[in-house]
């Protein structure tokens, strides 16, 4: 690992501290180095507050050292006025002579302009250090800004013989997840802006779709209810968490936290849902079920990541798990006793985000 890679790696570590809090902004970390000694660090804590570069500069006790220092940042410094002033201007103002950047910012108001501004000011700029790792960190932000849709994560648990539930018209679903994997699912919920289920899952499971087993915000809850036949006493309509209902009808009893959105069900509704979520600035979507809904995303090649829990249990029959003839690019396996959580990307889409 080179010196630049070492400090950008530290930027990535810092950036992760902003997980669940920065959206719709990306997670960013920054490190300031004076003669091979770190004199300042910072990360973007939450949207609307100071960016990583600002926090790193503020942490330096002797600002006179900045004139002989290098600032490392995982993402290109911004060059526009948003909720905060441009970071590129602050770097220029503090006369920091060198900037090392992990990856360029895909956001249209930046997209190389920060780098250009720094270079025009006579600052030495290096770009592309640990670029793949830096892009992976902000994969949700990149997908949203380049593909104009949320980053989509699929999640399900299945038995060894490929079923996600027993055949039923009521009662509780069969419990496949253990307490540890259930907690991991709630962590994933906290990391996403929204969570989607179909009508059958909402009716039979009556899920809260909350993060009760993990700290952090609740995602916006999404449910497809074409004919508005779901009972109003379901947990989804409790009014405690923001909920979108996709339907072809007009609502009967709207409330402040339940929004009804009309779709054209004579056409494919997934692109319509993606457009709605993009307009509402929802950058990441977790799809939890059921099997038909998950399969529709797979068949449409409309997913970026999947978490598949393999459970050492044989059901023999029931609701079949989603399947795909396409090859997965396996990222890693997480073991919980005899259970395995597979984290995978569709091979044809990995290049769009990470490379």
Regions found by a protein language model. Give the residues of each.
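Zn2+-dependent cytidine deaminase-like catalytic core
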Residues: 32-133, 220, 298
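Residues that form or flank phosphate/diphosphate-binding pockets in enzymes
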Residues: 51, 82, 109-110, 136, ...
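N-terminal pre-triad scaffold of radical SAM enzymes
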Residues: 69-79, 147-158
């Amino acid at each position: 690992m080179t010196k630049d890679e070492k400090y950008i790696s530290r930027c990535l570590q810092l950036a992760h501290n902003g997980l669940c809090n920065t959206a719709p902004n990306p997670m960013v970390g920054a490190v300031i180095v004076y003669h091979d000694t770190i004199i300042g660090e910072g990360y973007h804590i939450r949207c609307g507050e100071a960016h990583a570069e600002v926090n790193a500069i503020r942490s330096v006790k002797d600002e006179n050292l900045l004139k002989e220092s290098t600032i490392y940042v995982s993402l290109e410094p911004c060059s526009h006025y948003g909720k905060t002033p441009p970071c590129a201007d602050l770097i220029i103002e503090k006369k920091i002579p060198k900037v090392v950047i992990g990856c360029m910012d895909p956001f249209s108001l930046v997209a190389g302009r920060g780098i250009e501004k720094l270079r025009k000011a006579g600052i030495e700029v290096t770009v592309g250090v640990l670029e793949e790792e830096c892009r992976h960190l902000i994969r949700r932000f990149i997908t949203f800004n380049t593909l104009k849709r949320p980053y989509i994560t699929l999640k399900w648990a299945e038995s060894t013989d490929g079923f996600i539930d027993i055949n039923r018209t009521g009662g509780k679903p069969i419990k496949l997840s253990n307490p540890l994997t259930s907690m991991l699912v709630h962590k994933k919920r906290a990391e996403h802006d929204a969570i989607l289920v179909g009508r059958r899952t909402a009716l039979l499971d009556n899920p809260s779709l909350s993060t009760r087993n993990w700290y952090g915000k609740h995602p916006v809850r999404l449910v497809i209810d074409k004919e508005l036949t779901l009972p109003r006493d379901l947990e989804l309509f409790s009014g405690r968490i923001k909920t979108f209902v996709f339907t072809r009808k007009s609502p009967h009893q709207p409330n402040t936290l339940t929004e009804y959105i009309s779709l054209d069900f004579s056409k494919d509704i997934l692109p319509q849902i993606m457009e709605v979520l993009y307009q509402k600035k929802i950058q990441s979507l977790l799809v939890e079920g059921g099997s038909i809904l998950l399969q529709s995303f797979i068949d449409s090649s409309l997913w970026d990541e999947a978490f598949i829990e393999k459970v050492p249990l044989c059901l023999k029959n029931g609701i079949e798990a989603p399947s795909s003839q396409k090859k997965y690019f396996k990222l890693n396996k997480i073991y919980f006793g005899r259970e395995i959580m597979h984290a995978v990307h569709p091979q044809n889409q990995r290049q769009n985000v990470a490379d």
